[in-house]
Amino acid sequence: MSAVVMGYPMPILLNWNREYNRPAWHFAGSHIAKLESLLGAIETLLESKSDDVGEDDVAVLVDAYDMWFQLPPSVLLERYHRLNSEADARIRKQWKDLGISTDSPISPPRQDIIVTTAKDCFPDSYSGSDPHYEHWPKSPMPKDMYGEDTDKVPWSFDPARKYKKVRPRCVNSGLIMGSMGGLRDALKRSKEKIDTVAMKGRQLWSDQALIGEVIGDQEIWREWMRHLGSSWNGSAAFNDRNSLDRTVRDIADVALLGKRFEFGIGLDYNFTTAPPTCSSEEDGYFVNLSNETNIREESQKAGVPGDIRIHGIPSELRNIKDKLLSSTNWGTIPLYTDFFFGTIPIAIHHNAYINGLKGFRLKNWWHKMWYYPHLRHLITRRLQPTSSPPTLAEIDHNGDKIAYKSPQEDKLHKARVFSPKKPNFTPIDWDAVCQKPGHAVKWHDELFGDDKGPLAV
């Protein structure tokens, strides 16, 4: 419902009332199903040959149970393009610093898919999955962003807070977004890994492990590409295999047989999309962006070294075209903010579990969301019939203007359930989505808290 309030397209639900207990999946049933179902939905949409769906359209996958949106889709799309551009610039600089010629037949990779980041690198090789994190890039964030102890992991019984001062550079699969075509190809690679692992009887831990392995293979492949590119003399590259790590040689051998490893996947190092709150339990809170005193007090409470890192309203929030949000004063409403990164995330990912924080925040923080006092009104307005789906954003990107619109099916203003069997996308009533079976409290009473009864649209 937070996505509906903020004007995102009507959600497509994956694995609704599905069974996850395949023996080959071991403990990772719902996680593996998340990726397989997303692949199935994307393939079904792209194969429909509809003029409404294309390979360049952007899809967003989020965890359904612990993610609250607080900013509109135009901001997410603006940041998506910005993060991709920043990643492309870093890679071009890296190649230039290595002396890789611009006439090399190998071009620097470009980013298309973004995955949220984690401070703790899990699962690791001890779990049976091996993302090869030692081959991943270092974080581009400042080396002193947490002070002199940045990136130090103290000995501790606390499994989460010991990573508090680590700059995130590993994968968290709370949010994955990218072009439909790019996601399809990357998810096919993930499915290949699922099938291979299942045949070998190896433990499958999570979708996070699978995405991590795909990214790990990609980073190793990129290492090999840099090795070849740096020796390019205008007509040939010197493939000195003996100087390569064994892991790189293995990827190179398979790549020479035609296997693809580059999928344009990168990470949200900046914590601007929907970063996890695990290992960042006290790093953020709700503040008014125009209230510097409020920001300073909360930054000091969080332990931010030096001066405050939030300075007013982000530019992408200053010109919201959404009519329902256009009069919102973004500086005077409470927005969840990470004080170390100086960012206002698109959404809050409530996976901070230490001392029962997840359950506590899911129950006690909902009323802190800026739209809570207006929730019923906003949702009622969002669900009104329209003649055509709204424009979500118009992005200026490298001199081109890109317009993003909701799908035609959004005229129904209902969530849809994906099924691999036809009908593939079945509308579902909000009562069925929001009411937990056997739960004594009605969903509308819990969600709105206004004693006005059921939602009337």
What are these regions (language model features)?
Residues 4-13, 82-90, 109, 217-224, ...:
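Structural alpha-beta junctions
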Residues 132-154, 292-322, 401-457:
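Long, low-complexity, polar/charged, intrinsically disordered or flexibly structured peripheral segments
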Residues 1-2, 15-17, 72-75, 127-130, ...:
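Short coil/turn segments at secondary-structure boundaries
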Residues 142-360:
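Catalytic core and acceptor-binding pocket of nucleotide-sugar-dependent glycosyltransferases
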Residues 45-127, 174-177, 181-187:
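GT-A fold catalytic core of metal-dependent nucleotide-sugar glycosyltransferases
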Residues 1-58, 78-87, 91-94, 181, ...:
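N-terminal anchoring/stem segment of glycosyltransferases
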Residues 28, 57, 86, 101-159, ...:
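Intrinsically disordered, low-complexity, Ser/Thr/Glu/Asp/Lys/Arg-enriched terminal regions and linkers
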Residues 23-26, 326, 352-359, 370-377, ...:
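Extended, compositionally biased interaction tracts of eukaryotic scaffold proteins
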